[in-house]
Design a protein with these regions (language model features):
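Short acidic-aromatic loop segments in the C-terminal HATPase_c
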Residues: 95, 145-146
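C-terminal "cap" of GNAT-fold acetyltransferases
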Residues: 85-89, 123-124, 130-137, 141-143, ...
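Extreme N-terminal starter segment of soluble prokaryotic enzymes
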Residues: 1-2
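Conserved acetyl-CoA-binding loop-helix of GNAT-fold acetyltransferases
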Residues: 102-115, 138, 142
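Acetyl-CoA-dependent GNAT
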Residues: 8-11, 15-24, 28, 36-99, ...
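Short coil/turn segments at alpha/beta junctions that flank glycine-rich nucleotide-binding fingerprints
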Residues: 103, 120-123
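Active-site acidic-Proline motif in GNAT/NAT acetyltransferases
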Residues: 97-99, 103, 131-132
Length: 172
């Protein structure tokens, strides 16, 4: 398996896996019209190209034999979805294709985020996770994340609650 940093030429493949993994994760527990509105607004080709070109955001694919298994999106500084300190690093998205869940791929991507945080001498890694995504919450707790707040996440017309979790990044 390899982790590869993306650039704007990866936008089509990023859009494809972003939509697929978001649907696999959430479509059974949300209304289709809310899902579609979110996908249209947040995972459009134009939006993803813009995010790929933002110097304060980074995307990574995890690949095996040229197949994308999942991806990671990190935000630094002003790209963070909450107004946290500059020494925080946000995991905005970490998604794995359904067929590859339970194979430690999420842990590999999480370790990549921690490695980047260490290299940039950042203090905390943080994320928002839907309060009903129990599998993800358990994963983050198992990996040392602690709850520190909440924020709203809008999926179409549905205003949901994300739990905010953070992990102190140990210095090199």
């Amino acid at each position: 398996m390899q982790i590869r940093k993306l650039n704007s030429s990866d936008s089509e493949n990023l859009r494809k896996i972003s939509i697929q993994t978001f649907r696999e994760t959430f479509e059974e527990v949300n209304y289709e019209e809310d899902m579609q509105k979110y996908l249209d607004e947040n995972l459009s080709l134009e939006r993803l190209k813009s995010e790929l070109e933002n110097p304060d955001s980074e995307f990574y694919f995890i690949e095996n034999k040229n197949k994308n298994l999942g991806y990671l999106k990190l935000n630094f500084g002003n790209a963070q979805t909450e107004n946290f300190k500059k020494n925080y690093l946000e995991i905005e998205r970490i998604y794995i294709l359904k067929d590859f869940l339970g194979q430690k791929i999420g842990k590999i991507l999480l370790n990549k985020a921690i490695e980047i945080g260490k290299k940039k001498n950042l203090e905390f890694l943080w994320l928002g996770v839907w309060e009903k995504n129990h599998r993800a919450i358990k994963f983050y707790e198992k990996n040392g994340f602690k709850f520190f707040g909440k924020h709203k996440f809008v999926l179409g017309k549905d205003v949901q609650t994300d739990l905010l979790m953070k992990l102190k990044i140990d210095k090199l």
